[in-house]
Amino acid sequence: MTAVGAPGRSSGTVQAVKLVVLLAFVLLFLIPVYVLIVTSFKPLDEADPSSAWSLPGHWSTSGWSSAWDALRPGLENSVKIAVSGSIISAVLGSLNGFVLSKWRFPGADVVFTLFLFGMFIPYQAVMIPLAGLLTDMELSGTIRGLVLAHVVYGIPICTLIFRNYYVTIPDELIEASRVDGAGMLRTYWSVILPVSAPAFAVTLIWQFTSMWNDFLFAVFLGAPDSWPVTVMLNNTAGSGAVAVQYNQQMASALLASLPTLLVYLLLGRFFMRGLMAGALKG
């Protein structure tokens, strides 16, 4: 009995240690979130580093009000950039992935390799040529220019995700569609698109998060009237002339992070389904 019970106790101990370690990491993650939330609801005279751990003596939304006033233009710009850019890049990536996996043509492997190569080119390497291109197109400093930059840079990863996802779809479905006389677009619309929800969820979350959190493109290619929330947040952090307004800064950080959290909460189950279905598998 003792020999049989020992492995069970050992396994239980290992599981308990794993649970304690995981809870410790969760706690380390939640501590800054706690400070953010608590400080954002403090009046200005209570919001200072010495009392960061304490609850507000007087709960106030003044920090949220001032944060909203300061970030609203940036939030609107970020929504325009991230929503339109993620949808466009996902659609283009889906079409590319379909052609490269199911409607192949001579040289398809070379084209796919070039797409993969584009994933490994750092932003900094193309920033100056990209700025010159947008200037020539009269899109420099505009929201449309930022959307174009993000879409172009997001197409390679979107193409990879969709191509690897579509590889898992049986070729017999495509052949049956061809036998019925359907062309490329009809096959894509009737056969491929209805089963593409998991891959779209992966690419939309990926691209939305990337575009929402972008700072470098926005600063280098944007202008004050097209700056997204990340740039506005940076300006807010350095806008205190006399004293740092910690309540406003914490509320601003929370406001800037809420949209990406909401997107993941809404599409998270599809995101995991897309990963499990092979969206990121070779």
Label the model's feature ranges.
Residues M1-G12:
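Short, Lys/Arg-rich, polar N-terminal cytosolic tail immediately upstream
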Residues V14-G282:
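A structural signal for multi-pass alpha-helical bundles of membrane permease subunits
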